[in-house]
Amino acid sequence: MLDANVNNLELMSKEELVEILTKMINGGVALSFNGRRTAQMIQRKVMPRVVHINKELSYNDLGGKCNNLLVDGENLQAMVTLYKYRGTVDLIVTDPPYNTGKDFRYNDKWDTDPNDPELGSIVTLEDGSRHTKWIKFMYPRIQMMYSMLKPNGILAICIDERELFHLGMMLNEVFGEENRIGLINWQKSYSPKNDSVHLSSATEYVLVYAKNKGNAKTELLARTEEMNSSRLLNSNGNRVKWFA
């Protein structure tokens, strides 16, 4: 049975049809949402921008002394524009909107024209399609981040409990569950919220995936004396961790 989101089969490439058939044969868990195929294909419609180098903000005369770039722009369009860097990035750390009802805008025109300059309106908690809009926003960006990474590249993406599970499913689809390195949780507060009705969430998360876990290299930095000096001595004379 075909996914209800799959349509216009005659417009798909051979590779796309093979992908659909492979998933039908192999089965498994898949994230289903309205507009899935559009989200998977939309990056192809993004028009790259002309890059203008601001010499006043650049390091000296750009005479080979610096190999880094600071790009100001919408992230999906920026990644499409930087096509020559695909497959060359070691590490991507990203902090997308958490879909809190206050921090995420969506323009419905992006479903057909991702180049529309309007930011759209705030997606509120009362919006019944808020999760679908967020997934459609994120999916092409995750695809592009995957293509930007080196074979041994790493992605670290921040999120909280609102979209944690949807994000994890998207990353499993694009990167492969076998390439998940881990889930880091960090404590964002040390006291319960006064307005919480049930549980007071005190943590946020960082999902870490490798483009190819077998090629990825982590934990290569040994502890330094400076790191050790950040520990306090307890009554027994041993150094213990402390938190600011």
Question: Could you tell me what each predicted segment is?
Answer:
Residues L199-N215:
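Core SAM-dependent methyltransferase catalytic element
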Residues K84-G87, M169-E177, S200-S201:
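Short, surface-exposed basic-aromatic patches at helix termini and helix-loop junctions that form
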Residues F165-Q187:
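Conserved Class I S-adenosyl-L-methionine
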Residues M1-T94, Y98-P140:
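DnaQ-like (DEDDh/DEDDy) 3′-5′ exonuclease domain used for proofreading
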Residues T81-L82, H166-M170, N194-D195:
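A short acidic (Asp/Glu
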Residues G182-H198:
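Short, surface-exposed recognition loops and adjoining beta-strand edges that mediate ligand/DNA contacts
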Residues R86-I154, R162, E178, T203, ...:
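SAM-dependent methyltransferase catalytic-core segment centered on the flexible catalytic loop
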Residues L70, V93, A156-C158, N185, ...:
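Structured core elements
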